[in-house]
């Protein structure tokens, strides 16, 4: 008789820039989600697959829930609500360094319909950097008293391991959604590279420019000498933004490219040749068709 298996979906939600993607990466033990100090680094749902023994979790990392200002923002919020439609548990991540904001209240309202249906874990993150974590946690818990509160740092291996064990234990009996040897993410290789490129661009650009950048991988080829050739495009909305991304004498795009290549080589364990180009796609964030062309494939518009 076959052993029982347990599996389910866990949505990771929260306002922008609270550490959702860092937590996902550390739950999986491998980098699948982009990270930068800027809000809204995550723009679309990303599935991370964790299989341990006879238990499997499909984590759904979501964009930060916020008041949308354009079609991209509407897409990002839609990604959150769709992720909550059919889950077995929710991890609501908040930042213990600060008291709740209207965006946290927005998340709490989005989770209200799930109360009593699935477990909701209120995870107070950045415990290592918070001055008054207990006070902050109490304020967050008051927004959704039915949630189960816990405090941690997404960078603390022991604390993350404890959360992972508790989540695995919550999974209902059922077949695995992905084979045991499946990759840690449902992203294609090109999507994964594009997100790393966008992460490095966001770290090095300022004001509105990082939010106007979209990235797309056009070609991946293994050369005879073993070097991995990658052709990628960075899209911006205006010629002035293109000039900023390229930089004086091409210095900025070179800096972005070098950082991306180094990260890819470290993660892949092989040499990478990164061929970058910057193009203008006017007002792509406001255009539903442009969003679909650039890989944001939900039913926006």
UniProtKB/Swiss-Prot annotation:
Stated membrane topology is: Peripheral membrane protein
Origin, by domain of life?
Bacteria
Provide the protein's localization.
Answer: Cytoplasm; Cell inner membrane
Region (G1) spans which residues?
14-21
Q: Which Pfam families match?
A: KH_2, MMR_HSR1
Positions of the UniProt region annotated as G2:
40-44
Protein name per its UniProtKB record? GTPase Era
Mention any one GO cellular component term assigned to this protein in its UniProt record: cytosol
Where do the record's region annotations for G4 lie? 125-128
Q: What does the entry list as the binding residues for GTP?
A: 14-21, 61-65, 125-128
Subunit:
Monomer. Binds to the 30S ribosomal subunit, between the head and platform, contacting the 16S rRNA. Contacts ribosomal proteins S7 and S18 and may contact proteins S2 and S11.
Era-type G domain boundaries: 6-173
